[in-house]
From Swiss-Prot:
GO terms for biological process: proteolysis; regulation of receptor signaling pathway via JAK-STAT. The gene is MST1L. Residues 21-110 form the PAN domain. This is Putative macrophage stimulating 1-like protein. It comes from the Eukaryota. It comes from Homo sapiens.
Length: 715
């Protein structure tokens, strides 16, 4: 039997139950939202209510739908601010979800309103308990006379709990310890806050559920009570031990970055004694990512045990993915110290511990010599006083502690006026001795040592093997690439068989990408609104030079996108997995991935490609190709005022407007190396498109190539 038609409110009647005023509970708290989604009923005899165009926002729609017994969901048109009330949900018979570019779907949280997400386990038709029913897991039945029924699964009598401080909690608890209802994260009343879901994409800020986006003691939320800003939620911890870890542990040496080290070393390299761990109530911003409850430095607190991070006693451990084991110290003014004196396990051989050429571009984290002696910090003056090296474009200055990296004005220790390149720490901000080769020594990277009897020595690095590329990075150039001014702004006709076109649900090109494996595309994070957005209807087009190829064009391959995985923090990368592998041929080819941490030498000519805006310089309906010279980050930061990071790279800004524009983002910066084209950069948005003499910025792929390989390996 078809559901009864929706009863509509007269426009004037909506005011008594429409959008909430500041200090009141929002009616949208009763709904869960699916962005970019419409709900359709397959029976023509069943029709939704008419569109109401007199609503202020989605809250007012919720206020109209909530009191009606026959309204279970509504569409909200984000463009026209229209509202359509619905007498069914996605769980009703003969209904289906349809991805849309104009509407958001709001469904009641009641018995019908449980939306499957990547984390809540609502899969297929399995028994679940999304509403915490005391009877245990249940499901909707296929019997028209029985709406839902318990699955009679025996209870284990284990309460819902959170590990550690609950930063990974993604459940559906939406009330605080005192019973107050939580405020929606996407609303700014009754309490204003900085945790907008669109800015904290990895924190699971769904609807009004309890979360812990700031590393607090446990999950919490803003309340709907205007007098009480925020409260913790009633979620107990899962026992007294920390969440189980998967790393292989060692007690006498460490592997990798030392995440699995559980030894008893309690002094730093500089012999500062580690402080005993005690709990603190708030984590300072600069140490938030350490996810610890460690002691305040210099305090005389007694011994304590920390849940988040398993900090027992005062040992050097690495619980946050830093470059090596570390601890908080008792030395005033030195908050954190690294314990580099702990030896590395003999079976720990890291492929990235190698250098190319003479090692001038090495930016790894090795900090010991070939004899195992710890390197002296470049900023230190003991046991060896560093000598000034003025060698061509580079300089390593001593006699001051005002060390800088990048091309910045020198301080009082340099001849005025002056601006020199200063090498210091170039890959991370947590400390350590990164080892460049500032004087071009042909024997490789070196450092001053902590041994007073040995001024310097070469580092425990090997020369990287010759890079071997097999079936990637090969192409047959089909078009003349000499002088014709078409394509990318200032570009020319070209062939880039690994450059793909990303298409939205309407089949429109919106970004470029690179084919790095038969079933994997690498592109820019900024091409997508969220890391968890619905991908139904999104496709990748390959094998064509044209932005709008003719129907039946030979060689064109259209493959749906199956899933999306966002890269590490700060990478601005996304990997897209396709529903099936593509067919490789002359029109479709893989581009090679670079070695880890490889730095492209300045002056290298590389190629960008895409179908984006040409700014009037040519035809933007075909593939855009242009050649650009790579420049050093030091030179790039002169224009970008020091904002270019080590995980990014630049190409020079030319007098003519040549570069990538809207629609080219996510596309490759390909360099010809070892007779193959290698993916060195991914184009990310800049403030302007092809600004004259303005360097373009790319994500440096070699920094994140280990993550790329891991994702593709695990699928």
């Amino acid at each position: 039997m078809a559901p009864a038609p929706v009863t509509l409110l007269a426009p004037g009647a909506a005011s008594s139950m429409s959008c909430s005023q500041p200090g009141q509970r929002s009616p949208s708290n009763d709904f869960q939202v699916l962005r970019g989604t419409e709900l359709q009923h397959l029976l023509h005899a069943v029709v939704p209510g008419p569109w109401q165009e007199d609503v202020a926002d989605a809250e007012e729609c919720a206020g109209r739908c909530g009191p009606l017994m026959d309204c279970w969901a509504f569409h909200y048109n984000v463009s026209s601010h229209g509202c359509q009330l619905l007498p069914w949900t996605q769980h009703s018979p003969h209904s289906r979800l349809w991805h849309s570019g104009r509407c958001d779907l709001f469904q009641e949280k009641g018995e019908w309103g449980y939306m499957p997400t990547l984390r809540n386990g609502l899969e297929e038709n399995f028994c679940r308990n999304p509403d915490g029913d005391p009877g245990g897991p249940w499901c909707h039945t296929t019997d028209p006379a029985v709406r839902f029924q318990s699955c009679s699964i025996k209870s284990c009598r284990v309460a819902a709990c959170v590990w550690c401080n609950g930063e990974e909690y993604r459940g559906a608890v939406d009330r605080t310890e005192s019973g107050r209802e939580c405020q929606r994260w996407d609303l700014q009343h009754p309490h204003q806050h900085p945790f907008e879901p669109g800015k904290f994409l990895d924190q699971g800020l769904d609807d009004n559920y309890c979360r812990n986006p700031d590393g607090s003691e446990r999950p919490w939320c803003y309340t709907t009570d205007p007098q009480i800003e925020r409260e913790f939620c009633d979620l107990p911890r899962c026992g007294s031990e920390a969440q189980p870890r998967q790393e292989a542990t060692s007690v006498s040496c460490f592997r990798g970055k030392g995440e699995g080290y559980r030894g008893t070393a309690n002094t730093t390299t500089a012999a500062y004694l580690a402080s005993v761990g005690t709990r603190k109530s708030h984590i300072s911003t600069d140490l938030r990512q350490k996810n610890t409850r460690a002691s305040e430095v210099g305090g005389g607190a007694g011994v304590g045990t920390c849940c988040c991070g398993d900090l027992r006693e005062n040992f050097c451990w690495n619980l946050d993915g830093s470059e090596a084991p570390w601890c908080f110290t008792l030395r005033p003014g030195t908050r954190v110290g690294f314990c580099y004196q702990i030896r590395r396990c003999t079976d720990d051989v890291r492929p990235q511990d190698c250098y190319h050429g003479a090692g001038e571009q090495y930016r790894g984290t090795v900090s010991k010599t070939r004899k195992g002696v710890q390197c002296q910090r470049w900023s230190a003056e003991t046991p060896h006083k560093l000598q000034a090296l003025t060698l061509g474009r580079h300089a390593l200055m001593s006699g001051t502690r005002a060390w800088k990296w990048l091309r910045l004005p020198c301080h009082d220790f340099a001849p005025a006026p002056a601006s020199v390149h200063i090498y210091l720490r170039t890959a991370c901000t947590t400390g350590g001795e990164l080892l460049p080769d500032p004087d071009g020594d042909s024997h490789g990277p070196w450092c001053y040592t902590m041994d007073p009897r040995t001024p310097f020595d070469y580092c425990a690095l090997r020369r990287c093997d010759q890079v071997q590329f097999e079936k990637c990075g090969k192409r047959v150039d089909r078009l003349d690439q000499r002088r014709s001014k078409l394509r990318v702004a200032g570009g020319h006709p070209g062939n880039s068989p690994w450059t793909v076109s990303l298409r939205n649900r309407q089949g429109q090109h919106f970004c470029a990408g690179s084919l790095v494996k038969e079933q994997w595309i690498l592109t820019a994070r900024q091409c997508f609104s969220s890391c968890h957005m619905p991908l139904t209807g999104y496709e990748v087009w390959l094998g064509t030079l044209f932005q709008n190829p003719q129907h039946g064009e030979p060689g064109l391959q259209r493959v749906p996108v199956a899933k999306m995985l966002c890269g590490p923090s700060g990478s601005q990368l996304v990997l897209l997995k396709l529903e099936r592998s593509v067919t490789l041929n002359q029109r479709v080819a893989l581009i090679c991935l670079p070695p880890e941490w490889y730095v492209v030498p300045p002056g290298t000519k590389c190629e960008i490609a895409g179908w984006g805006e040409t700014k009037g310089t040519g035809n933007d309906t075909v593939l855009n190709v242009a050649l650009l010279n790579v420049i050093s980050n030091q030179e790039c930061n002169i224009k970008h005022r020091g904002h270019v990071r080590e995980s990014e790279m630049c190409t020079e800004g030319l007098l003519a407007p040549v570069g990538a524009c809207e629609g080219d983002y996510g596309g490759p910066l390909a360099c010809f190396t070892h007779n193959c084209w290698v993916l060195k950069g991914i184009r990310i948005p800049n403030r302007v498109c092809t600004r004259s003499r303005w360097p373009a910025v790319f994500t440096r792929v070699s920094v994140f190539v280990d993550w790329i390989h891991k994702v593709m390996r695990l699928g």
